[in-house]
Amino acid sequence: MSEIQNTMIVAANAIRKGSVDVRTKKLCHYTSPDGLLGIFKEGAPTLFFSQYDSLNDTKERKDIFESLKKYCDKQLKKGIMSKELYDAIVSIPQSDLFGITRKTNKKLILDNGEIVEDITAFADEECYTYICSFSKNNDSLPMWRMYSKAEHYEGFCVEFSSSAFSRKQYYRKGFSVELVKVIYDERKKMELIEGVLSPIMGLYDSATKRDKENLLSIVKIMIRDFQFVFKNKSFSYEEEIRAVLHIPKTESNNTGQVSERKYRQSNGLIVPYVIYNMEASSVRSITIAPTIKEEITVNNLKDYLCSKKLSHIHIISSDIPIRNV
């Protein structure tokens, strides 16, 4: 194995190490009373996924590029990174290419004559990206304040199972969805970037043109994988886990799991979005906001869920001792 190949493996491993496994985490979605009724309007739950550039963080998707430039500026000043590598990295553009798998009707005939049906097609395609936000905390005062859409912390927190976003939900269906845990801490961001770039910096200048392209491809993979993971530390109270949905721009989605591209008004903006359909079993519980009149709310919520054949959902009262004034 060449030194370049070994370096690429080390850098790729740093990317994998930086990825956070969120399969065992709670997926808690804060919403208003109207939002709750919207989620269960059709019985089985549905969620709105909004286009990434319409979310509350005006620097959504930009943090990875700012963090990367900050790291490269420091290494260039120290003389550790060459100007050539610096220029190559900071000029990497934002890309909407993401890997999509599709089921095809094509057949493959193997050398032994065996026929393989329904070949899976994989390609990087230009995609729209939509995000639905969750928290790992189902009873957070700042989250009640931010997302329940009322002055008196009135709202609900719906806990979903991560199985609603597992690979089997999208494989070969013409879209992709992944769960990621947001990174806010600046030190962790720099450590991840260091793990990827450190082995590359020592070899890049002396590498062939082809090897330089290969080394830069690892940096591009890091940007692709973490552009929706890095977020400004001001939002750290959200403890966000997000579902990131990629849908090709060139085709209509007709799987039934994801709606066509739609538009709605929010805070004066026209927001593109899609509706993601889930199974009833994906909902685990609903937590009631701290200042809602508990007894009548619990009874009415139970009645509502029963009418939607969702009586399996556990209802939880907030433990936050705050008075409604």
Per-segment meaning from a language model:
Residues 1-325:
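Partner-binding and oligomerization surfaces adjacent to conserved cores of proteins
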